[in-house]
Structures are given as C-alpha cells and as structure tokens.
A protein has these predicted regions:
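Short secondary-structure junctions
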Residues: 22-34, 80-85
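Short beta-strand-to-loop capping motifs
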Residues: 5-8, 47, 64-68
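Amphipathic, interaction-prone secondary-structure segments
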Residues: 28-53
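Intrinsically disordered, low-complexity regulatory segments enriched in Ser/Thr/Pro
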Residues: 52-76
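Intrinsically disordered, low-complexity regulatory regions enriched in serine/threonine/proline
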Residues: 4, 72-118
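A generic structural signal for beta-strand entry/edge sites
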Residues: 1-3, 40-42, 61-63
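Terminal, regulation- and interaction-focused segments at domain boundaries
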Residues: 1-18, 22
Length: 118
C-alpha cells in the first residue's frame, strides 16, 4: 500500500530526488510549467516496477508518495523520519494537472531541447 510523506523540507526533498537519480532511478514524468521549482514541482521516478512520486509547493514543502517499504528505505538512507498526512501537491487531480501540462520526456530527449538527456 502506498503512503504519502508530507512536510518534507525543500533541501531534503531535492537531495532525495538527486540521490535516487544517481542510484539509477529514471525520470518518467516531470512538471515543466513556467513556475516549476518556483511555486510548484512534480517528479515521477521509476526503477523496475517501483514508482515514487514527488510533489512540492513553496507553501507546503515536499511530499513523497511510494510503497511503505520504499519510504522506510529512504528514511534509513537519509537519516530522517517522515510525517504522514493529507497531501496538497500529490492529490490525484493535482497530479493529473501536472501530467497534462508536461511534455512527455521522450519528446524532450528526442529533440534534446535542454542540450542534455533528462
């Protein structure tokens, strides 16, 4: 069953994403709106059959949605203790909005818009 960790400090939230990407997790969705990383942000990472979703707002900080076992591993690796609660950035409708506003990553990578592979 998936759980949602809430109120994660921005620096910790960003460092978890960076560490997972360095560990081989692949970005399968990313919010590319003009306010990405300023007001709101969304990332979806996958490795094998595992999936982790990250939501962030500058008002409510970071959120992470994943299986309990994955969240426990993240707590151990990053020496933190997550709080769990009602999400703001990772509500189903908000995620759908992020995904709708995002270009598929294969398009970005195919045309290499940012001069690097994402």
């Amino acid at each position: 069953m998936k759980k949602i960790a809430t109120d994660i400090e921005t620096e910790v939230w960003a460092s978890i994403i960076k560490a997972l990407r360095n560990d081989g997790w692949i970005v399968t969705a990313k919010y590319w709106g003009f306010d990405a990383g300023i007001d709101d942000d969304y990332w979806c990472l996958r490795r094998g059959l595992d999936k982790i979703e990250f939501g962030w707002s500058n008002w409510t900080e970071g959120e992470i949605k994943a299986k309990r076992s994955i969240l426990e591993k993240l707590e151990e690796k990053h020496k933190i203790k997550f709080k769990f609660g009602e999400p703001m950035s990772l509500k189903k409708l908000v995620i759908a909005t992020y995904k709708f506003q995002s270009l598929p990553l294969w398009i970005l990578n195919k045309f290499n818009f940012f001069d690097r592979k994402l």
